[in-house]
């Protein structure tokens, strides 16, 4: 069983409040999507508007602190978080999608999975070289998708100012895989 760490030194009051909210609004689903996996279900958070608002507010603070001009959400649950953050900031939203889900010209990045590869895409004109982009997702686990997203955005000249996630699973190598990207988890498990 994993434990949830206490807030790290130097965290803001909003981050601490978000961590407290997350502790009470994440449900563990045993053996899903396969045996041996404990899935971190965020639907209790999504179904509680006040709690969701606290978490979105903390993510907005992360974006502001880093001077983000664009918010990029990683499919699929990253969209649920990135869209309200971008809206509150008046910032552009860039969806990072699975291959074949975006119409028109795209840029892509392929990355390794345990058994095979996967590809993510953005619209070819989604990001300009002068933009400061904050990546947003629900969980940092192995880091494959986040590393590919970082490479995709950096490859078009954008400055990726960080990766903000609800949860970092510290027992998995995600942080190492996305290094030197600044990882900002609201909660570390």
Swiss-Prot record:
Coiled-coil ranges (or none): none
EC numbers: 2.4.2.7
Gene Ontology cellular-component terms listed: cytoplasm
Domain of life the protein comes from: Bacteria
InterPro entries, per database record: Ade_phspho_trans, PRibTrfase_dom, PRTase-like, UPRTase/APRTase
Catalytic reactions on record: AMP + diphosphate = 5-phospho-alpha-D-ribose 1-diphosphate + adenine
Lipid metabolism recorded as keyword: no
Listed GO MF terms: adenine binding; adenine phosphoribosyltransferase activity; AMP binding
Complexes and interactors: Homodimer.
The protein, known as: Adenine phosphoribosyltransferase
Species the sequence originates in: Frankia alni (strain DSM 45986 / CECT 9034 / ACN14a)
Lineage: Bacteria, Bacillati, Actinomycetota, Actinomycetes, Frankiales
Primary gene name: apt
